[in-house]
């Protein structure tokens, strides 16, 4: 059992037990995070190895917890940039072994404005700097990651236009990602 999670999650396990005993069908998800602007401390679950470690702990404790998989945050944690774009697909492939623990997908666009990248704006075209080959490779990898016929919760955080939101949904549909 990965001991580094015990001090952080043991405090909330009693709350988890209370919720699950009263509302058995409730899905509880834990999201990975890696914020460059967050100043309140370090996140426990940011990288692919940390996500896999958490899933091993969930399994060892026989918990019905799952992951809300924030894909852009994973890329931030691994410092994936357009120059290191080969890692985009490799990271998704690496997480295939724990996909049964992924209960939700958090995805958003990103676009350039006044020489800096703005999160939660734009669609996947602008997220990948209009590199359609890279976007297609990402969507293909995402489709393979989730080719297990499991329906997942979809959390889209797009603060720009509804066209951007619809564009992301259309891309996910084309990739064969099943979601609610």
For each predicted feature, which ranges?
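Active-site beta-loop-alpha junctions enriched in small/polar residues
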Residues: 3, 10, 33-37, 72-76, ...
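Hydrophobic faces of well-ordered beta-strands that scaffold small-molecule active sites
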Residues: 5-7, 28-31, 65-70, 103-107, ...
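Short, surface-exposed amphipathic charged segments that create phosphate/polyanion-binding patches used
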Residues: 44-46, 122, 169-175
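Active-site acidic/histidine proton-transfer and metal-coordination neighborhood
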Residues: 1-66, 168
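Gly/Pro-rich active-site loop or hairpin
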Residues: 39-45, 75-151
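C-terminal helical cap(s) of enzyme catalytic domains, especially alpha/beta-barrels
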Residues: 162-180
């Amino acid at each position: 059992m990965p001991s580094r999670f015990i001090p952080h999650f043991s405090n909330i396990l009693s709350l988890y037990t209370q919720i699950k005993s009263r509302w058995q069908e409730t899905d509880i998800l834990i999201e990975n995070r890696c914020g460059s602007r967050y100043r309140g401390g370090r996140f426990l679950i940011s990288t692919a190895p940390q996500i896999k470690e958490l899933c091993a702990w969930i399994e060892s404790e026989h918990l019905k917890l799952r992951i809300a998989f924030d894909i852009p945050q994973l890329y931030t944690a691994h410092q994936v940039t357009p120059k290191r774009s080969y890692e985009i697909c490799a990271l998704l492939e690496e997480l295939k072994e724990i996909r049964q623990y992924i209960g939700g997908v958090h995805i958003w666009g990103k676009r350039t404005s006044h020489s800096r990248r703005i999160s939660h704006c734009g669609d996947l075209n602008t997220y990948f700097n209009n590199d359609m080959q890279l976007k297609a490779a990402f969507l293909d990898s995402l489709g393979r990651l989730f080719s297990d016929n499991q329906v997942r919760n979809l959390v889209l955080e797009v603060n720009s236009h509804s066209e951007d939101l619809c564009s992301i949904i259309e891309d996910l549909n084309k990739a064969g990602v099943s979601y609610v």
